[in-house]
Structures are given as structure tokens and as C-alpha cells.
Amino acid sequence: MIGGLFLNTLSFVIVSNHSIVNNTANVHHIQQERVIVQQHQVVSAITQNYYPEFSIAVLFVSFLALYRSTNFKTCVGILMFKILSMTLLGPMLIAYGYYIDGIVTTTVLSLRFAYLAYFWYVNSRFEFILYNTTTLMFVHGRAAPFKRSSHSSIYVTLYGGINYMFVNDLTLHFVDPMLVSIAIRGLAHADLTVVRAVELLNGDFIYVFSQEPVVGVYNAAFSQAVLNEIDLKEEEGDRTYDVS
């Protein structure tokens, strides 16, 4: 197929219709009604046979328009492919006669781009289009996709160490974690601060950002024996010896 990704449903129906008409042009007048009925059935069958191809075209373009990734390089590659699809591939399909595929590809991608461009205009950040999302979190000027929880509450957890945390593919260093804040912009609008820094056994930290203060953290990952061992080590470390 030249210049196209999918089968053109309309072109196959038209070609099949013409071939059937040419083959039945010299049929006797008595059998004409029967031939017309057969012709209608064949064209309908051909149209139904190419419905899956048209559905695949729509699903693929919809998937491409909505697909998002957290990797920066992957997002750049997908964005470039979308731009080429809207400006080059779509018009090429229309020029070669694949009207359905070309119109669907260009229309769906253009509508998605226009929808995200609104958030780009309101917040003055191009990352809405780059990450293909309507909600972003900004950590000291660095943008990353924001993932909502299952019950739509707004909070963020970032993994890191004693003086750094990972924001998507970036590493943010800080002196005091209490000075780090997160701004949620887009469909959701919120400002989050660090409410809890959870230290793990390996020395790493999980930083919890929320609008509500954390009352406590329940530790359910350790058995009672491990907890007793940790308490004993802490007691030994707190002992002081008087040497005279």
C-alpha cells in the first residue's frame, strides 16, 4: 500500500461495486431483480469485511493520541511522530485517496493537540504537550506527570535519600526537605508540602507530600522479632559509660 497504514474501506466498496455492475450489465431483464439483490448482498458483505480494518485505524490513532510515558526521551520521540503524522502522514493519505484514514488521523491528533494547547496557554508550560497529560506536578521548576490515586485524593510520594529525591528521571538535591514544595497544575490545582519523611531500613527515604498533616505512620513491614532487635540496637547506641 502506497502512503498508507490501513486499508481504505470506501475505495474497496466502490471498486467491487463497479466490477459487479460490469459483470451483470448483459443479464436478461427477467433475472435483473435477482442480480440486484445478489449485488446488494455482496457489497454489504464486502463493507462488513472491511469494518475491522477501519476500527483498527480508529483504535490505533486514538491510542497514539492518548499514549503517555514518563520517560523524557520517549515523550520527545512520540511527540515528533505525532507532529509528522498530523503534518505529513495525514495529508499524504488524503492525497493518495485514503480519505478515511487521512481524515481520522489528522482530526484525532489535531483535536488532542488543541486540547493540551489550552493547558499550555493557561500555565505557560510546554510540558503539558510533551508529556501528553492534563495535570502536571512542578517541583522547584521541574515538571513531571501527576498520577492520581484510586480515590482521587491529592498527594505525592517521592523516593530518595537523606538530601535528595527523585522526580521522574531527575534528581533533586536539597538541604532541608521541609523547604521542598510541589505545585499541582492543570485539571487539579494544589500546593503540597512535605508532611512526613519515612526512613527505610536501608537508609533511603520516602517523602510524603500532602495538603493534610500526617498524624502517624503504621509500620507493618517488620515482624515483632525484627522490631525488638532494632530497639535493642537503639538502646545500646544510647548507653553512656562513665570512665573515671
Curated annotation (Swiss-Prot):
It comes from Porcine transmissible gastroenteritis coronavirus (strain FS772/70). The lineage of its organism: Viruses, Riboviria, Orthornavirae, Pisuviricota, Pisoniviricetes. InterPro entries: a/bCoV_VIROPORIN_3A-like_CD (IPR046446), a/bCoV_VIROPORIN_3A-like_TM (IPR046445), Coronavirus_Orf3a/b (IPR004293). GO terms for cellular component: host cell membrane; membrane. The chain crosses the membrane at residues 46-66, 75-95, 102-122. It comes from the Viruses. It is found in: Host membrane. It is a multi-pass membrane protein. Residues 135-214 form the CoV 3a-like viroporin CD domain. Residues 41-131 form the CoV 3a-like viroporin TM domain. Keywords: Host membrane, Membrane, Transmembrane, Transmembrane helix. Belongs to the coronaviruses NS3b protein family. This is Non-structural protein 3b.
